[in-house]
Structures are given as structure tokens and as C-alpha cells.
């Protein structure tokens, strides 16, 4: 498909069109990616965020959260204390200490009384903190609030980690290492636990797939109605989960509209340009404008 920037209307007219589409929608499918959280102030590519949230690593020369994650991506015997020195802090500060971000607050106000379903690739817990009905959220990429066995010895067991995270964080020394006695271990087999994130084929996905059928059924049951695909901050890290399916579904549904809001990545295939509204701007600013008109 040929890409287009969809610049057929002014910003104000696009906001008006979005409001009308949302108000008249029989169903709204919302796709939330990393750009949504970035719009709320936590961008994994922003050096300023490293200085604010992870000064210990900024002092070591790291320029982004992505760069730090790359340095501690895999747990090994050699790096286990430093690995958890970072990941315990990351989960503590991103998942547990970060409050509900403004873009999510605004989204709640916009869609709370609508017929909606959410798919998110984020693991930061912001959709949970938003208070959305958990039966209307499909989050297949994992969650920072649970661990899984590194093997894994079970394909359906994950473990809540808040207390484990607290113990590790409290034990971190000046070398950014945890006390070895707090390394989390699998209660079933005794091997190491790791964050439950979709990194490879060892990911324990079953606990996150319970709403998959509901998500599919919601889409299919509304395909011939006025269905809106509202995509917020979805880029090309995992486009096969939200971005590409939303394009394909918009193309195949006679009354569908794709609303794509994303700073720097608000293009659509030319084939669905007439069925799309794209805004290349800060997501939260757009949501504020939408909220003013609803």
C-alpha cells in the first residue's frame, strides 16, 4: 500500500470530524501504543526522562531508557545483581510510582460512556490505573507488575511482584546492584524469575490472552456498523498487533473510520485515505481539544 500523510483538511476541521465520528460511532476500538505514555511525559527515547527517573544511569552516560534496557536486556549469572539493580528500579518507578498520566485521564473522559474495546501493547499499567473495565482491555505484551519463570516451567503461571520489587529496590547499593538474597526465584522450580514481557518464545502469554476472543468478537460483531478505530501512539515496533490490523480492518469494513493520532508517524495507506483522519501532533494536546468539544 502507498503511504499518504492525509493532509486534506485543517487541524480544526479534523478535530471536528473526530468528535462527530466518536459521537456517532456504534463501536470504538482503541489501540494504545508507547506514544500515548510518551505524550504523558515518559518517553523511552528522552534523555531528560533518564535524568529525572534514572539519575544513577544518566551519571553513567546513558541517554535513553531504551539504551539502559539494552544493556540489561538478558539475565545471566554474570549480571544478575546489576540486571535487577536496573529492572527493580524501572518497574518501581514506571509501574508503581508513576501516577495516571494525563492522556489516559482524558481518554477515560472521552470514551467512558461509549461502546469500546481497548488493545494496548504497553506494559506500564496505565490502562489498569485508568479504571477501564478489565473485560474490555486486551494487553498481549505482558505487564510490569508480574514475573514469570525464566525457563519457563509453566506456560500459564505469573507472579505478582510488588513486594519483591520493594525488597530489591531497598537493597540496591552504590554499585547499582541488589542484595543477592533478594533475587526472585520461581516458587515451582527454583529457577530465576524475570519480568513477564514479550521478548522471545519463552514469554508466558496465557494470562494476557484471556480477552483475545472478546476482542475479536467485538470487532467482528461491529464490522458492518459505524465502527471507529482510534489509534493513539502506535508506531512500528510491533505494527502487526494494532497498526496494520487497524488499516486492514478499516479497508474491509464499509462504514469504518481510522483515526490515527501520533507525532511523527501519522501516515495511512493511500487506499484508505478517504476513510481516515490523521493528526501528526502531540496526543494529549489532541485529546484535550477533542474533550473540549464533546
Residue ranges and their predicted role:
Residues 1-294:
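Conserved catalytic alpha/beta core of Sir2/sirtuin-type deacylases, generalized to analogous enzyme cores
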Amino acid at each position: 500500500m502507498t503511504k499518504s500523510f492525509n493532509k486534506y483538511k485543517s487541524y480544526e476541521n479534523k478535530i471536528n470530524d473526530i468528535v462527530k465520528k466518536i459521537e456517532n460511532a456504534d463501536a470504538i476500538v482503541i489501540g494504545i501504543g508507547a506514544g500515548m505514555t510518551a505524550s504523558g511525559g515518559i518517553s523511552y527515547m528522552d534523555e531528560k526522562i533518564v535524568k529525572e527517573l534514572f539519575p544513577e544511569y544518566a551519571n553513567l552516560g546513558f541517554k535513553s531508557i531504551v539504551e539502559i534496557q539494552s544493556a540489561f536486556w538478558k539475565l545471566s549469572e554474570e549480571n544478575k545483581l546489576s540486571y535487577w539493580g536496573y529492572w527493580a528500579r524501572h518497574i518501581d518507578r514506571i509501574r508503581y510510582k508513576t501516577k495516571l498520566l494525563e492522556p489516559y485521564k482524558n481518554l477515560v473522559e472521552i470514551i467512558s460512556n461509549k461502546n469500546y474495546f481497548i488493545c494496548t501493547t504497553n506494559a506500564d499499567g496505565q490502562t489498569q490505573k485508568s479504571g477501564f473495565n478489565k473485560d474490555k482491555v486486551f494487553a498481549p505484551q505482558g505487564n510490569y507488575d508480574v514475573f514469570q519463570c525464566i525457563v519457563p516451567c509453566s506456560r500459564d503461571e505469573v507472579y505478582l511482584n510488588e513486594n519483591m520489587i520493594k525488597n530489591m529496590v531497598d537493597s540496591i547499593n552504590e554499585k547499582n546492584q541488589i542484595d543477592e538474597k533478594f533475587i526472585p526465584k520461581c516458587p515451582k522450580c527454583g529457577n530465576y524469575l524475570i519480568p513477564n514481557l514479550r521478548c522471545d518464545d519463552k514469554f508466558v502469554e496465557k494470562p494476557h490472552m484471556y480477552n483475545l476472543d472478546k476482542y475479536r468478537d467485538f470487532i467482528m460483531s461491529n464490522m458492518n456498523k459505524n465502527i471507529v478505530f482510534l489509534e493513539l501512539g502506535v508506531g512500528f515496533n510491533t505494527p502487526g498487533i494494532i497498526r496494520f490490523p487497524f488499516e486492514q480492518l478499516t479497508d474491509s469494513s464499509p462504514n469504518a473510520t481510522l483515526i490515527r493520532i501520533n507525532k511523527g508517524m501519522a501516515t495511512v495507506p493511500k487506499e484508505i485515505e478517504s476513510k481516515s483522519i490523521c493528526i501528526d501532533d502531540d496526543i494529549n494536546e489532541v485529546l484535550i481539544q477533542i474533550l473540549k468539544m464533546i
